[in-house]
């Protein structure tokens, strides 16, 4: 085992593999996914890896190549741990508390400028980008392990690209959609918010 290598745990959510596909496990094993466990959540296939590699990026990319080489109809929909996290999950990953996360979010603790939530589930559960939260934590001296930030950014990029490909037909069908969206000012506002967040991080880093 190389000194630079470690075991990385991650999971692929798959489409195109059904519980009755008896040959799927053997095909994945022969394609180099012998460090993965295939299971099902209902009819959704989950492929969990414990892969030895120098980095999470190297581990995930080699696993993606393995799934492709298996010759199945499998499509990787998402890589977990997902970028979307609740306050409880942020607390778990940081060793903080839900109350502490709430105080960061509301600006009552820390330097402020905590990333805005990306979505909500129901009336009370907010969801954030872990990549944005990890970057904020690192920039403000609350997270010492730079690998956590790098891994969070990598997973966010991977899932963004998978989603872009998955939903490409929604915008491809209407070539003027992006232009119409641009005219609302929403994209410009998002670029402004991103730029401001980057400046805030640079200023406190």
Go through the PLM ranges and name each one:
Residues 15-36:
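Short amphipathic alpha-helix segments
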Residues 17-19, 52-56, 131:
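Helix N-cap motif at beta-to-alpha junctions
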Residues 79-106:
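Polyanion-binding surface elements
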Residues 96-126:
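Major-groove DNA-recognition helix of helix-turn-helix-type DNA-binding domains
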């Amino acid at each position: 085992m190389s000194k630079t290598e470690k075991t990385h745990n991650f999971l692929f959510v798959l489409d195109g593999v059904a519980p009755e596909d008896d040959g799927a496990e053997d095909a994945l094993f022969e394609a180099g996914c012998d460090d993965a466990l295939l299971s099902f959540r209902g009819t959704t296939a989950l492929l969990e890896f414990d892969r030895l590699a120098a980095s999470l990026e190297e581990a995930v990319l080699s696993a993606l190549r393995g799934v492709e080489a298996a010759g199945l109809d499998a499509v990787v929909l998402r890589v977990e741990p997902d970028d979307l996290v609740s306050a409880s999950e942020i607390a778990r990953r940081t060793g903080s508390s839900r109350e502490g996360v709430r105080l960061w979010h509301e600006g009552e603790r820390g330097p402020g400028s905590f990333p805005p939530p990306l979505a909500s589930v129901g009336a009370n559960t907010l969801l954030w980008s872990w990549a944005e939260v990890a970057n904020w934590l690192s920039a403000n001296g609350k997270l010492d392990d730079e690998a956590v930030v790098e891994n969070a950014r990598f997973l966010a990029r991977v899932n963004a690209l998978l989603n872009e490909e998955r939903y490409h037909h929604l915008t491809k069908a209407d070539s003027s959609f992006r232009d119409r969206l641009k005219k609302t000012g929403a994209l410009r506002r998002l670029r402004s918010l991103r730029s401001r967040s980057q400046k805030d991080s640079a200023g406190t880093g």
